[in-house]
């Protein structure tokens, strides 16, 4: 990494990294030079002053689109039990308000199968299990602000994926795998013992046990125990979740790549691995997009996980503030905002 001149930074890679632009927005890659007396920034605003209670920003006169930046100054403050109307924008609002919007996060909530466990190793069995679950019912009753989804990837990353409904008769699929009322499938479901996870798990178990072919042993454990069991592969079906570090499908698709340290489900598929590695090497954007679609569809077709919903962030935006648009990463940039003046 080196500066060619005052305005050009050159980054040379040892291999193709198609998601580098998205990765550069991650906090771990921010500039190391951070002298508090003269912080460096190339954004729409510069730090004017900061302390433990507030951060004051001033418009950057060198910003390339400075003429499109409305506010001369922006102040960031901690939100501590005060009226929302005292602010223009409040992120992660703890209360209900008419000016509340929910911005999608790159975070999914799902249950994970241990694909090395013979009871759930067959795709047809997992498909039968998934067909018994109503994600809408669970979400509407437990976390209505979330986005119900039976897809593993966040909604914004599903470009081109077929969303047609596929009729599935769970009992037929289970019977084909020698599972019946006399010889039911015994499932062990692990989840954390905090109230939200308990409530979701109870609804999930209630839906699964509507079939006489399933017997479910549900166990609530501490978060630490849940993580330890996931790490060891000591589970059959386990409550899970994932938040992407950067806005790119590979941040989710890597969970099923056999060589990934984040693969805790035991999935190992030569075709999936080959496609995944091909996407990493390809310099053709269209080809990469087609591969992402194939990988995502493979996850869905084999029911490699049991997705329930995508998280959202509640954001209060004053009715006088314009320019805030919902986006796939749930980010609001001050440079995009402007105030509507009442006549």
Residue ranges of each PLM-predicted region?
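Extracytoplasmic/peripheral linker and loop segments enriched in polar/acidic and small residues
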Residues: 1-2, 217-226, 254-319, 343
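Gly/Pro-rich hinge or "lid" segments in bacterial periplasmic/extracellular proteins
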Residues: 6-8, 12-81
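Alpha-to-beta junction loops
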Residues: 7-9, 81-96, 207, 213-215, ...
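Immediate post-signal peptide segment of exported/extracytoplasmic ligand-binding proteins
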Residues: 41, 67-71, 171-188
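Extracellular/periplasmic solute-recognition and catalytic clefts
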Residues: 48-58, 73-117, 139-142
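Ligand/substrate-recognition segments at binding pockets and active sites
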Residues: 52, 177-244, 313
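Periplasmic-binding protein-like
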Residues: 116-158, 162, 200, 299-304
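Long beta-strand-rich cores associated with HINT superfamily self-processing modules
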Residues: 315-343
């Amino acid at each position: 990494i080196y500066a060619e001149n005052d305005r050009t930074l050159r980054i040379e890679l040892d291999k193709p990294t198609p998601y580098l632009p998205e990765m550069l927005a991650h906090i771990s890659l921010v500039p190391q030079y951070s002298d508090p007396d003269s912080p460096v920034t190339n954004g729409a605003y510069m730090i004017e002053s900061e302390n433990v209670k507030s951060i004051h920003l001033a418009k950057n006169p060198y910003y390339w689109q400075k003429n499109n930046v409305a506010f001369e100054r922006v102040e960031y403050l901690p939100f501590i039990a005060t009226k929302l109307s005292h602010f223009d924008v409040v992120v992660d609002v703890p209360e209900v308000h008419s000016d509340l919007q929910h911005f999608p996060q790159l975070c999914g909530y799902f249950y994970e199968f241990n694909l090395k466990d013979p009871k759930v190793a067959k795709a047809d069995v997992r498909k039968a299990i998934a067909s018994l679950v109503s994600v809408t019912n669970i979400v509407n009753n437990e976390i209505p602000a979330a986005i119900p989804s039976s897809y593993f990837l966040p909604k914004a990353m599903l470009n081109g994926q077929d969303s047609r409904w596929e009729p599935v008769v769970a009992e037929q699929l289970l019977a084909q795998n020698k599972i019946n009322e006399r010889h039911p499938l015994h499932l062990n479901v692990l989840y954390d013992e905090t109230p939200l996870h308990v409530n979701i798990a109870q609804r999930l178990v209630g839906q699964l046990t509507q079939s006489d072919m399933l017997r479910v042993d549900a166990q609530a454990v501490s978060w630490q125990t849940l993580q330890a069991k996931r790490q060891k592969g000591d589970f059959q079906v386990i409550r899970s979740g994932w938040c992407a570090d950067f806005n790119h499908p590979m941040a989710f698709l890597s969970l099923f790549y056999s060589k990934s340290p984040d693969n805790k489900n035991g999935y190992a598929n030569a075709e999936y691995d080959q496609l995944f590695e091909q996407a990493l090497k390809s310099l053709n954007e269209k080809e990469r997009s087609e591969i992402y679609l194939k990988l995502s569809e493979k996850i869905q077709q084999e029911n490699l996980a049991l997705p329930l919903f995508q998280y959202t962030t509640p954001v209060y935006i004053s009715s006088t503030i314009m320019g805030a648009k919902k986006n796939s990463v749930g980010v609001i940039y001050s440079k995009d905002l402007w105030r509507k003046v009442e006549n």
